[in-house]
């Protein structure tokens, strides 16, 4: 029989480990505890952001449940960066970098302390992939607990969320919103704890993790402030102890087939473009053969059947009341769009977990549709290629009346310069804004362009202006926007060669992104291009810029270490 403390006994057994045990006695351990599995609780609690401000009660619930199930809990902290607070500033360069820092920090504690399992608890966007990357890397029994979504805010009879505040900025600058109402939206958009409420990045990733089998059923759409979130966390910890007993590990669950399940659900719920980047990183950590083209393969066969913000109507709390991710998965499973034989952290297969879920969503809800009445017949996250991005880039094509545009390039070498032009109302109908040198290496850190895209939407230009960047977009972004352009400008990608006024085409139907300049002229510009000096030469951002892979491979830091 497998010993449940197979790893932790490396630091607790034998005469030579007397000093190690002394450290444990100092924090309240008793001799009987050294035969128990030692389970980490990676706690993302923080008073920095509402996304993480409600996590301590979940971490406490996990500790209590672990101890009650015969394990010994070891809580440690993981960092977080608030995208909503850093957005539009230099601080946003640390957001994607924090994904790597979170993965590294969890790996450090789990392996450095020989833990036998780990409960990862996170809230804000990069907590999600960072934690899952660590689970895939370490491959010790683990489970992901999402901190839960925020509830909607309210102002003058309207439901609000954080994107309402970003879009209000553009409405105010264009004279469409009063200063009083701007303040009203600002003060009521986020009413309490929990992650941003639409199908933005955090809720996209939590939904995907449930579909992946690494989180409990229904857990991904619960509100942080509801009692069921604490109860689900308790259950998650108990389930993890059972997984330790069964030696059920992340890589038994995270397989190519389960990744296909997760991406299918991302398409069905209308999830964030960031999911493409993050699942490239997760599959890299799990050593699964997965490329950016696999997203396009799945997009073509999975329709969008959930009507969610930012381009739709509803929030995660509405989805939860309508049946949650299990209802979405059951619809897909019945049509052969999911692999029912994939294992989950519960010890049951996907098909077994969904056995009692109705095949048809409730008639009294409007959030989840049936496959014969989808919002869109194909998925929404399209991979475009062309001379601007031969490696591929990502666009979200839901909510658009016309998913193609050809127009003059308005070129900016940073988000800040582009934002200044937008706020000064210098961008007009038909323009294509190009924001470059914001990629993994050039930014560094691939800032999210929620501020400029929301300002454009607020000014009424969301349908008539295109935007191309080697940076990223928030899960709250919608419009004719294309991100993750690779190769990026900093390494000499074609996006670096676009001149002000050049004709550029974005065509989501043809999956095309093209600089309409002849090859000879592009070659001439390429020969004259010189790489700019790095923006940082010391510290974390400099390290990330040095190590980061191309966006088409997830912008990870451990991919090319042997090159």
Swiss-Prot record:
Family: Belongs to the IlvD/Edd family.
Annotated Gene3D superfamilies: IlvD/EDD C-terminal domain-like
Source organism of this protein record: Polynucleobacter necessarius subsp. necessarius (strain STIR1)
Binding site for Mg(2+): 83, 125-126, 448
The protein's enzyme class: lyase
Assembly behavior: Homodimer.
Coiled coil regions, renumbered to chain: none
Task performed by this protein: Functions in the biosynthesis of branched-chain amino acids. Catalyzes the dehydration of (2R,3R)-2,3-dihydroxy-3-methylpentanoate (2,3-dihydroxy-3-methylvalerate) into 2-oxo-3-methylpentanoate (2-oxo-3-methylvalerate) and of (2R)-2,3-dihydroxy-3-methylbutanoate (2,3-dihydroxyisovalerate) into 2-oxo-3-methylbutanoate (2-oxoisovalerate), the penultimate precursor to L-isoleucine and L-valine, respectively.
Protein name according to UniProt: Dihydroxy-acid dehydratase
One BP term from GO: L-valine biosynthetic process
Entry EC number(s): 4.2.1.9
Cofactor: [2Fe-2S] cluster; Mg(2+)
Molecular-function GO terms, alphabetical: 2 iron, 2 sulfur cluster binding; dihydroxy-acid dehydratase activity; magnesium ion binding
Record keyword Heme present: no
Superkingdom as given in the UniProt entry: Bacteria
Chain residues that bind [2Fe-2S] cluster: 51, 124, 196
UniProt cross-references to Pfam families, sorted A to Z: ILV_EDD_C, ILVD_EDD_N
